[in-house]
Amino acid sequence: MDRIRIVGGAPLDGTIRIGGAKNAALTLMPVCLLTDQPVTLTNLPDLADIRTMAALLGQMGVGTLLNGAESSAGRHIDLDASGLSDTTAPYDLVRKMRASILVLGPLVARHGRARVSLPGGCAIGTRPVDLHLKALEALGAHIELKEGYIHASVEGRLKGAKITFPKVTVGGTENALMAATLAEGETLLENVAREPEITDLALCLRAMGAKIDGIGTGTLRVEGVDTLGGTSHAVVPDRIETGTYALAAAATRGRLTLTGTRLDLVESLVDHLRRAGVVVTAIEGGLEIDARTSALTGVDVMTEPFPGFPTDMQAQWMAVMSTARGASMITESIFENRFMHVPELSRMGADINIHGGSAIVRGVAGLSGAQVMATDLRASVCLVLAALAASGETIINRVYHLDRGYERVEDKLAACGATIERLRD
């Protein structure tokens, strides 16, 4: 099992190109199931989860062709579902990645049936799919749970409906939106998630011929159409990768230029960084992060749905706050059990106490390298940031989590002065 070795203590200095958003790409890939025309996605990140989704679609009979490699324009994938032969998403693939549930809505909407294994791929508390299923039932789908599978079917077409989500759900919004594009009549989706990845999905669907109003707001109005066409669509920049490398600059008191990204994707994080003492400047085609001349100050955060502070940045923020002046409170309001990185940070000398859904972080003079273990994707990169800031050597075990969400992380950091290498057993 791969490990990552880091010798920390040196400030980062250089340029990192931000890739396409993993969460957007995983949502966009299933749109091919809504049409018999080719769909091309560009600016695609090269990640394990992307390959898993491609394998899942391929097993259903979708033509999948991945191209490109290290080019600055990013990879692209050609998808063709005209020869779809199966509407089952099997356990052996779905268990690796919960985003697999996003094939459910498109399959039912266009093909009238789907059999999808209950998802896996994440160790962050309970992430139920009941809101996905209730939304599809509201559109007329018949849902049964049998032997670990979701069985969904509809006679004829789905029917438009008014759906008000009881709480904001990203995946539920995405599944309902895709299904509604081919439903008969109008669908009103209220209290929807407003993440940039959902805006990206809606813009892609609109380019395919979907009739969607309210993009970027909390209410989406969808007028169903008979068919959708193909399209070519560039995946939105990855705001979580953007934020992670911005925090890497802060953690090491360094300077990084991030290209291929946008300020509007990370405004909440940037606001918190500036309050902590980091200089963030919007430049053409990206951002410049400069933490060289300031002693960072502890700043409280509470995770919230977009446009609030993202839950996927909580662990990384904690790593930075571990060496900031004073104390900070980090409150996790989205997922339960998302402080699994705290014991590992504590092994490196961090002073953190958990009280319910909040963690109190008291900044220390410095962290020390140690043997640590990654428990999930964001905890993995949190430990990378802590190791970059720490004195001495850190070995991070179980980094397969890291490969699910970050492309060539060791190469990008090494190019900016980090002493980092992957150890293969």
Swiss-Prot record:
Pathway: Cell wall biogenesis; peptidoglycan biosynthesis. The keyword Flavoprotein does not apply. SUPFAM superfamilies: EPT/RTPC-like. One of its GO terms (molecular function) is UDP-N-acetylglucosamine 1-carboxyvinyltransferase activity. Belongs to the EPSP synthase family. MurA subfamily. Pfam families: EPSP_synthase (PF00275). It catalyses: phosphoenolpyruvate + UDP-N-acetyl-alpha-D-glucosamine = UDP-N-acetyl-3-O-(1-carboxyvinyl)-alpha-D-glucosamine + phosphate. Its main location: cytoplasm. UDP-N-acetyl-alpha-D-glucosamine binds at residues 98, 127-131, 312, 334. The active site is at 122 (proton donor). It is found in: Cytoplasm. The lineage of its organism: Bacteria, Pseudomonadati, Pseudomonadota, Alphaproteobacteria, Rhodospirillales. Cell wall formation. Adds enolpyruvyl to UDP-N-acetylglucosamine. The modification 2-(S-cysteinyl)pyruvic acid O-phosphothioketal is found at residue 122. Its EC number is 2.5.1.7. Phosphoenolpyruvate binds at residues 22-23. GO terms for biological process: cell division; cell wall organization; peptidoglycan biosynthetic process; regulation of cell shape; UDP-N-acetylgalactosamine biosynthetic process. This is UDP-N-acetylglucosamine 1-carboxyvinyltransferase. Gene3D superfamilies: Enolpyruvate transferase domain. Keywords: Cell cycle, Cell division, Cell shape, Cell wall biogenesis/degradation, Cytoplasm, Peptidoglycan synthesis, Pyruvate, Transferase. GO terms for cellular component: cytoplasm. It comes from the Bacteria. InterPro entries: Enolpyruvate_Tfrase_dom, Enolpyruvate_Tfrase_sf, MurA_subfamily, RNA3'P_cycl/enolpyr_Trfase_a/b, UDP_GlcNAc_COvinyl_MurA. It is an enzyme of class 2 (transferase).
